[in-house]
């Protein structure tokens, strides 16, 4: 009976613990870990956690802009002891990375147009060198550069093969000691 209760609880909570997804309007969201301290905003707005923010976007946003407007209504509390940023895109191709500025004491939300991101602050891309960790600014620049090269070669004429090539370019070998692997 105890095992059955655990399974029931897991089934009930699963919709609220998503990490990536796409809704019926074509809005997709992905969460990526960062190397900075977890954001814990405290401006007096209602507080939302990482996984609930994803659920909010998937349930209520029809565009990337709507997703940004929704997230701006909340103070972010990064869950699981990690910091994160979100990549959101919609059916029109409006892609943005949503970051909580690691150089700002208030950790303001910044929504920056970008066509790809990995595990570093897009806001501080110039401070991130490839093939190394870059303190609070993150890592994975080499994977971002590889994806950007794939996109540049296609000049905006993206096909399924382009997407597959970008995914392969961004892939990394599994590492049991890394949460981002």
How would you label these PLM feature ranges?
Residues 1-16, 20-60, 65, 81-84, ...:
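C-terminal, well-structured catalytic/ligand-binding subdomain of enzymes
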Residues 73-78:
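A short structural micro-motif
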Residues 68:
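Extended, Lys/Arg-enriched charged tracts that mediate electrostatic binding to polyanionic substrates
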């Amino acid at each position: 009976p105890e095992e059955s209760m655990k399974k029931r609880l897991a089934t009930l909570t699963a919709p609220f613990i998503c990490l990536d997804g796409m809704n019926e309007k074509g809005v997709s969201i992905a969460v990526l870990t960062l190397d900075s301290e977890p954001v814990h905003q405290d401006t007096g707005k209602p507080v939302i956690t990482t996984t609930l923010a994803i659920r909010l976007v998937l349930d209520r946003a029809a565009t990337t802009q709507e997703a940004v407007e929704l997230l701006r209504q909340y103070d972010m509390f990064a869950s699981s002891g990690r910091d994160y940023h979100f990549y959101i895109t919609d059916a029109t191709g409006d892609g943005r990375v949503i970051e909580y500025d690691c150089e700002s004491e208030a950790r303001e939300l910044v929504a920056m147009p970008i066509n790809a991101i990995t595990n570093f602050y897009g806001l501080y891309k110039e401070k991130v060198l490839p093939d190394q960790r870059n303190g609070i600014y993150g890592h994975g620049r080499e994977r971002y550069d590889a994806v950007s090269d794939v996109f540049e070669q296609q000049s905006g004429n993206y096909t399924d093969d382009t997407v597959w090539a970008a995914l392969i370019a961004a892939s990394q070998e599994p590492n049991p000691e890394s949460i981002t692997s």
